[in-house]
């Protein structure tokens, strides 16, 4: 950061992101007194932003909670092993680096040229969940932001024929962990600008050589085009995800259509 204008911009943006982070945490009761929160730190802009917001909140919150930053070193070629330890030591943050060679497994299983992201993410999630349980972590914090949630909604809608996105808070399927997404109200534009102003030591996400998920790229481009024509489009879509009318959908599990009968008519 080189001038006062940048410092003022950073201060304003930081307050804005922290306000949104605090808002979603309060609305969904994400953090409780005595929590041990594991921040999954990949070295990307979003996870750095997440860690920074939780550290700021930790200083101001009326409750007490622990933070531990955890990175999974998957032994991808060219991964800069020293970057995260050096950064976290300088910040005085408790951290742990898990070393697992999932890269070799993924390369062996997935044919050349195919995206490895699906298998890689499933393996990563399992390893992180195991670590959380073994270390008495009460909340696993992920860096997904508003745009990730919207994109996932459209991916499921267009390609899976289902209406679902990413919840802000969930109990894992095996009921071993609670996952929270404190950046759910924050846009990708905000995390990108914040990471640039803070000059985080970003680690590229494509060290494995995997191609981008073309479906997600298509959805992201579509949403960005919509946003150009209507700057509030993403906000409106995001609002819709918490404004659902089950009786106006077709899912019999969500609304009892079957038992609506002529006896219910009131005239």
Curated annotation (Swiss-Prot):
Top class in the EC scheme:
transferase
Q: Name one GO molecular function term.
A: ATP binding
Q: Which one GO biological process term can you cite for this protein?
A: tRNA thio-modification
Q: Where in the cell is it found?
A: Cytoplasm
SUPFAM superfamilies, alphabetically? Adenine nucleotide alpha hydrolases-like (SSF52402)
**Gene3D superfamilies, per database record:** HUPs
Catalysed conversion reaction: cytidine(32) in tRNA + S-sulfanyl-L-cysteinyl-[cysteine desulfurase] + AH2 + ATP = 2-thiocytidine(32) in tRNA + L-cysteinyl-[cysteine desulfurase] + A + AMP + diphosphate + H(+)
**What is this protein identified as?**
tRNA-cytidine(32) 2-sulfurtransferase 2
Q: Which organism is it from?
A: Francisella tularensis subsp. holarctica (strain LVS)
């Amino acid at each position: 950061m080189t001038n006062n204008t940048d410092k003022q911009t950073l201060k304003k943006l930081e307050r804005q992101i922290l306000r949104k982070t605090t808002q979603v945490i309060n609305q969904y009761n994400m953090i409780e007194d005595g929590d041990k929160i594991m921040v999954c730190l990949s070295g990307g802009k979003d996870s750095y932003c997440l860690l920074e917001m939780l550290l700021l909140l930790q200083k101001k919150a009326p409750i007490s909670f622990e933070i531990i930053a955890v990175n999974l070193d998957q032994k991808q070629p060219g991964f800069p092993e020293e970057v995260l330890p050096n950064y976290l030591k300088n910040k005085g943050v408790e951290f742990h680096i898990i070393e697992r060679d999932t890269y070799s497994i993924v390369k062996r299983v997935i044919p050349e040229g195919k995206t490895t992201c699906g298998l890689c993410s499933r393996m990563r999630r399992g390893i992180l969940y195991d670590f959380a349980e073994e270390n008495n972590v009460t909340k696993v914090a992920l860096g997904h932001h508003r745009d990730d949630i919207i994109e996932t909604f459209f991916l499921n809608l267009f390609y899976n024929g289902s209406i679902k996105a990413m919840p802000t808070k969930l109990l894992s399927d095996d009921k071993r962990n609670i996952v929270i997404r404190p950046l759910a109200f924050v846009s990708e534009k905000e995390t990108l600008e914040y990471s640039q102003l803070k000059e985080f030591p970003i680690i590229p996400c494509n060290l494995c050589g995997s191609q981008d998920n073309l479906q997600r790229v298509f959805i992201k481009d579509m949403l960005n085009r919509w946003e150009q024509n209507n700057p509030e489009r993403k906000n409106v879509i995001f609002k819709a995800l918490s404004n659902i009318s089950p009786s106006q959908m077709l899912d019999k599990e969500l609304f009892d259509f079957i038992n609506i009968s002529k006896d219910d008519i009131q005239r």
